[in-house]
C-alpha cells in the first residue's frame, strides 16, 4: 500500500518533467529524496525500517505497493538518518551489525548504495532486492523470460517452475561475476539497472553466479547478491560491500562506467579510496591461447580479477593493501597459483606461468577449461531445468572415440537418470601399457562422483567430494570445486583393438531423477604412464 507521503510524491510529479529542488523532505515517518534529475527521480525511505516505499520516476510510481525495497528481507527496525552536503544526499540506516548507505548526487537519476557488515545477516545471505511494479517494468535483461515465473507451477522446491511448457527459475537470470557489470528490468518507458562497481567483499571468485532478477507476477525483483550459500565456494567476507548503483532511465541502457570515488568524502564506514590502494601488473603465459585467460587475487578480506590481453599482459583493479593468493586460469581451470603482496600507492610487478600437463594421450573428450562447454545440453543448462522438453535426451549414452560428436556425451551424469555412460575406443599395440584415466569434473551434488570400469577392470571407488549443500545443475550452476579423479589402469588392461569404459555415479546418498547424486563433466582423458 502506498503511504500518504508516497501518494503526494506521485501527484506532485504527475507531469514527469517538473522537478523540485535537490533535497530532503523530512516527514514524521519518512524521508523523501528528490534527485533533481532531468527525468525526475523522487524516492521515499521509511525512517523506522530503511525500506524504500516509493520510487517515482518521470511521473510514474515504480515501487511495488505491497512490500518495500530493502537490504536482505528488510532490517525490521533501524536508526535512519538523512543528510545533505553540497551536491550529495546520504541516507544512513544502522543496526548493531549492518549499516546501509544510499547516496544521491544532484541531477543524477541514480541511487548509489553500499552495505557495511560485521556479521552475516541471520537469513544466511546478503542481498539488496528492489521490488518493482511488474505492470510498468515486466521485462528482465539480458536473458529475458527464463526467470519470469509468473503464474508458474512449482516443479522443484519453491524456486523452479513450469510456465507455458518451459521451466523457469530466478536462478536462470545469473551471470558470472566477471561478466556481470549490469543487469536490468524494463518496460516501454522505464528501465532500472543494477550497476555493479565493486565485487571486492563478495564471495565466490570471478566465475561465481547468483540471482539477478525475477518477475514473479506481483512484482519484478531486481537483485544484487553480495553473498549467499548458492553453490558457494568461499567463506563470507565482512566489511563494506559496494558501491553498487541502481540507475533509472527511460529507453536507454546506462553505461557501466560510473565514477563513485566521491564516496571517499562522505564518511562511509570501510570505504578505501584510490589513494589507499595498489595494483599488480605482469604477464601470464603458458596456458592454451584458444581460451580466455583470467588472473584472480583473493584473501580473507577481498577478491579481485581481470582478463588478460591476448598477449597475456594484465593489470589488476585497484586493490586493498595485503597479501593475496594469485590464481591463473585457462578458461575456468586453474593452471597456476602464486602469492603477491600489494602496498598502498604502488604497483607491484608479478608474472605468472602455468599449463595443463597430460602426458601422451590415447584419447581426450572435452577440454581443460573448467566448464562443461560443448557436452550435450551444456548450451541450455544455464537457462532451464534438466527436465525441460527443449533439452536433448540425457541417455544413458555411448560415446565412440573418433566418430561421436562431443554432444553425444552428457554434460552431467545423474545416478537415477543416465548412469552409466559408456566410452568405446580402439587402441594400438603400443597403447596397452599402464595408463591413467583422468576425469575432470566441475561440480558434484549429494556426494556424486565417478567410478570407472575399463574392460573387466573396476577402478577403485574415490572418496566423497566436499559437500556444498546446495542444488547445482537444476538451478543453472555448473561450477564447484573442480575435483579431478585419477584412475590407475594396470598394464594389460587396455587391449589392442576395441575397448570399453563405463563411468557410473556412486554415492551413499540417493534421490529422484535430476536430484539424484550427480556430477558435471569438464574433460575425460586416458593417457599412458611415462610414455
UniProtKB/Swiss-Prot annotation:
It comes from the Eukaryota. InterPro entries: Carb-bd-like_fold, Gal_mutarotase_sf_dom, Galactose-bd-like_sf, GH-type_carb-bd, RG-lyase_II, RG-lyase_III, Rhamnogalacturonase_B, RhgB_N. The keyword Methyltransferase does not apply. It holds the Pfam family RhgB_N. One of its GO terms (cellular component) is extracellular region. It comes from Aspergillus niger (strain ATCC MYA-4892 / CBS 513.88 / FGSC A1513). Belongs to the polysaccharide lyase 4 family. Disulfide bonds join 50-93, 184-193. Its main location: secreted. Keywords: Carbohydrate metabolism, Cell wall biogenesis/degradation, Disulfide bond, Lyase, Polysaccharide degradation, Secreted, Signal. It catalyses: Endotype eliminative cleavage of L-alpha-rhamnopyranosyl-(1->4)-alpha-D-galactopyranosyluronic acid bonds of rhamnogalacturonan I domains in ramified hairy regions of pectin leaving L-rhamnopyranose at the reducing end and 4-deoxy-4,5-unsaturated D-galactopyranosyluronic acid at the non-reducing end. This is Probable rhamnogalacturonate lyase A.
